[in-house]
């Protein structure tokens, strides 16, 4: 007895849906690197297609089936050199499996291990960041498919608040004046000590479109995020390392807005070869230490617009 295709029947309420699919799907993936060892990732996938108003449901099992087929094909036949390429492969396969779809989207994100050394004692440690990719495909009336892809990373760092630091500096100056110190001595003292402030654990995120024929290195994105906060964080720190990290962050205080703007500037400088219409997303979230809320800053723009603003 053949089962009827319930998904293909008409729905009771004839309204189209923008995205239908599966989320939180994990698969082991191997990414090739030229002249370097392969990277093995365990990414989490989100895959979606749109659904016309005339159809009750998508064929849900086809979406995880697509990921399984693409991942297996990578292992056996095809070499993939980037997570964004993997996303594009899945999008194209989604259109094959879901012939009624006019839009398909894939998001993947994965932990990414980085080998680091502590800043003073040079102790080896493994640091964890996140890498991510997105591909979005559209099929026109003639059946032609166009796909845009993005790649990015998320990195944790430390930020020090400039406002609180300035308040404490003013308090210190007033107390030193009360104790009879000269302006010259006060200046020497302040130049010799680190002024306290409250800190945040900063989370920087950058996503950059990868136009056809271009490459965007994830390692470069990670470096930009790290260098855009007050300082880096490390899994392993000895005493001298800890003192160095804390002092460095307090000598480089930054608001959440400063971090976002620094990332934007560095993205424009590092990826100066990308076309004007390349999409860029920059986001900074600072987990506050003296508030219950978090601080947030974001910019979504085209590369050309950013270049014009920065006059680069």
Curated annotation (Swiss-Prot):
InterPro entries: GTP_cyclohydrolase_FolE2/MptA (IPR003801), GTP_cyclohydrolase_MptA (IPR022840). One of its GO terms (molecular function) is GTP cyclohydrolase I activity. Pathway: Cofactor biosynthesis; 5,6,7,8-tetrahydromethanopterin biosynthesis. PANTHER family: GTP CYCLOHYDROLASE MPTA. Converts GTP to 7,8-dihydro-D-neopterin 2',3'-cyclic phosphate, the first intermediate in the biosynthesis of coenzyme methanopterin. NCBIfam families: GTP cyclohydrolase MptA. This is GTP cyclohydrolase MptA. Its cofactor is Fe(2+). One of its GO terms (biological process) is tetrahydromethanopterin biosynthetic process. The keyword Metal-binding applies.
């Amino acid at each position: 007895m053949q089962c009827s295709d319930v998904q293909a029947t008409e729905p009771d309420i004839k309204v189209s849906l923008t995205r239908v699919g599966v989320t939180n799907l994990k698969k082991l993936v191997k990414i090739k690197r030229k002249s370097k060892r392969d990277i093995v990732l365990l990414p989490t996938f989100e895959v979606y297609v749109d659904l016309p108003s005339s159809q009750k449901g998508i064929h849900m099992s086809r979406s995880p089936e697509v990921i399984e087929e693409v991942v297996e094909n990578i292992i056996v036949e095809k070499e993939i050199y980037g997570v964004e390429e993997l996303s594009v492969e899945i999008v194209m396969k989604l259109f094959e499996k879901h012939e009624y779809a006019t839009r398909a989207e894939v998001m993947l994100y994965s932990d990414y291990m980085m080998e680091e050394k502590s800043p003073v004692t040079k102790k080896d440690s493994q640091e964890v960041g996140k890498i991510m990719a997105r591909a979005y495909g559209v099929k026109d009336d003639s059946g032609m498919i166009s796909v845009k892809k993005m790649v990015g990373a998320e990195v944790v760092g430390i930020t020090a608040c400039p406002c609180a630091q300035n308040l404490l500096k003013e308090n210190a100056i007033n107390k030193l004046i009360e104790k009879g110190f000269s302006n010259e001595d006060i200046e020497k003292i302040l130049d010799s000590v680190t002024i306290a402030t409250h800190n945040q654990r900063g989370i920087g995120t950058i996503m950059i479109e990868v136009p056809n024929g271009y490459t965007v290195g994830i390692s470069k994105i990670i470096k930009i995020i790290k260098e855009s906060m007050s300082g880096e964080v490390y899994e392993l720190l000895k005493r001298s390392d800890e003192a160095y990290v804390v002092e460095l962050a307090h000598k480089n205080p930054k608001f959440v807005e400063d971090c976002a703007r620094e990332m934007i500037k560095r993205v424009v400088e590092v990826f100066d070869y990308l076309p004007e219409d390349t999409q860029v997303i920059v986001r900074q979230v600072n987990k506050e230490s003296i508030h219950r809320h978090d601080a947030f800053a974001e910019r979504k723009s085209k590369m050309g617009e950013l270049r014009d603003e920065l006059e680069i």
